[in-house]
């Protein structure tokens, strides 16, 4: 079974709107991913949070707090996009490296691999769960833990 990890930047989710979500763009992404799923590909997705928050540009907020806000922005993105995917006919599950109540599942390698094997599109939100790391770092870390291929030249943000 082939597995892939996709990184969707927050800016990509915002489309022409530049902030928030562009529903038409997100539906378009869902249709493309559905083709992969229908072809038997196991899909995991990491999102950025730049459509809601760019902490590195803040001059007044502590860097740790700014990064935590960014992590939560990725959670919002994954919850939203996962629901768009459900609307498009896919099963999904959102994982985070920290407890997020009833909204997400706490990440474990076994649970993530099980969800992939069940045919679910798996979303990894919250980055590494630690400040000072980009969502790309979180994507690479989670990919390694979940036996997902990682391009050694970097992760392409779409």
Explain the meaning of each model-derived region.
Residues 40-44, 119-122:
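Loop/turn-to-beta-strand initiation segments
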Residues 58-122, 137:
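Ligand-binding beta-strand-loop-alpha-helix segment within the catalytic cores
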Residues 21-27, 104, 129-136:
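Active-site glycine- and acidic-residue-rich loops that bind
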Residues 5-9, 44-48, 95, 124-127:
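Short beta-strand segments
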Residues 1-43:
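N-terminal glycine-/serine-/threonine-rich phosphate-binding loop
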Residues 37, 79-89, 141-149:
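Alpha-helix C-terminal capping segments
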Residues 12-14, 50-55, 101-102, 131, ...:
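Short, active-site-adjacent cap segments at secondary-structure transitions
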Residues 110-158:
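Internal active-site segments that recognize and position negatively charged phosphoryl groups
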């Amino acid at each position: 079974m082939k597995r892939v990890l996709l990184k969707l930047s927050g800016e990509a989710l915002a489309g022409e709107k530049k902030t928030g979500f562009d529903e038409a763009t997100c539906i378009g992404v869902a249709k493309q991913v559905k083709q992969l799923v229908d072809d038997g590909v196991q899909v995991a997705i990491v999102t950025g949070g730049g459509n809601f928050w760019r902490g590195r540009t803040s001059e007044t907020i502590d860097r740790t707090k700014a990064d935590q806000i960014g992590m939560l922005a990725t959670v919002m993105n994954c919850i939203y996009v996962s629901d768009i995917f459900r609307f498009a006919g896919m099963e999904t599950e959102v994982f985070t490296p920290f407890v997020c109540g009833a909204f997400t599942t706490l990440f474990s390698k076994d649970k993530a691999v099980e969800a992939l094997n069940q045919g679910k599109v798996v979303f990894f939100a919250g980055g590494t769960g630690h400040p000072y790391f980009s969502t790309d770092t979180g994507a690479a870390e989670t990919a390694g833990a979940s036996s997902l291929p990682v391009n050694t030249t970097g992760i392409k943000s779409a």
